[in-house]
Amino acid sequence: MAVLQPPKTNYGKMKLFINGKWIESSTESYIPVYDPGKGEVIAEMPSATKEEIDEAVEAAYEAFKSWSRLPVPERMQYIFRMKYLLEENKEALARVNTQNHGKTIRESRGDLRRTIENVEAAISALYSLAKGEYQQEIAKDIDEVLTREPVGVFSIITPYNFPIMIPFWFIPYALALGDTLVVKVSPVTPLPMMATMEILANELPPGVLNLIYADDAMSEHLVTHPLVEGTAFVGTSRVGLRVYELSASHGKRFLGGGSASNYAVVMPDADLDRTVSVLRDSKFGNTGQRCL
């Protein structure tokens, strides 16, 4: 079992994770990262340069050539290892999550539980998602065969409110199915995913999973990069629409989730005590940054 250490109080200048290595950015643009509970700057996040974005995408592109050809059971072993490492380090990651985001430690532990469940779901669904179909005599003297193959490099752009959980809505599925990734997280809460990558860094082949930080202009460069096949996005509807427009205009795939605040219909026979408790947590839980 991992020895639990308290989170750092000063992370210094953060690094990019590209092609299996932590790289100090050559950018002159650094963004302060806060511990909102104390109002203190605890890290400086680099906004990657165009050349660094290109390097990350090209690393993922080169890694795809071998990663996509691995048999499904071999890729599955990497995802099993990912699950084990997340479980082994979930308390340490939850503490970094709370430190950088501000949510309660109970909520962060819940985030890690859901993160691990996403990995488990990817493992359980992999063979169904990867297998093709065969239809005999679909028409006279015609049989139909459908195969599913890895697509290529995808970018993942995620918001600040669930810094680890939301990236893992996509990471285990994409990797298990043979694609490679460049992940761009929110500049508000970049530390939890950085801490996660520190745990996973030596467990995947170089270039398969890359982590960068970028401003708006460089994020658009990532989305429209010629070697990127598509983008998975979660964030505000305004930004999501922009990513959708960029993806569509460049002939790329897009999977998006935008802003949401669900309505509640309270029926006359509802248990009001329970209803009010649920609505309160939905509205004010996660420091008021929940979209469910």
Indicate where each model-derived feature is located.
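N-terminal Rossmann-like NAD(P)+-binding subdomain of aldehyde/semialdehyde dehydrogenases
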Residues: 1-142
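Residue-level signal for inorganic ion chemistry
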Residues: 39, 75, 97, 178, ...
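Conserved small-residue-rich beta-alpha loop and adjacent elements
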Residues: 134-205
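A structured beta-alpha segment of the ubiquitous adenosine-cofactor-binding alpha/beta core
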Residues: 143-144, 211-229
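Periplasmic-binding protein-like
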Residues: 172, 230-234
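Hydrophobic residues in well-ordered beta-strands that form the structural core
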Residues: 183-184, 213, 256
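Short gly/pro/ser/thr-enriched loop/turn and capping motifs at secondary-structure boundaries
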Residues: 188-191, 211, 218, 238-241, ...
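ALDH superfamily catalytic-core signature
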Residues: 238-292
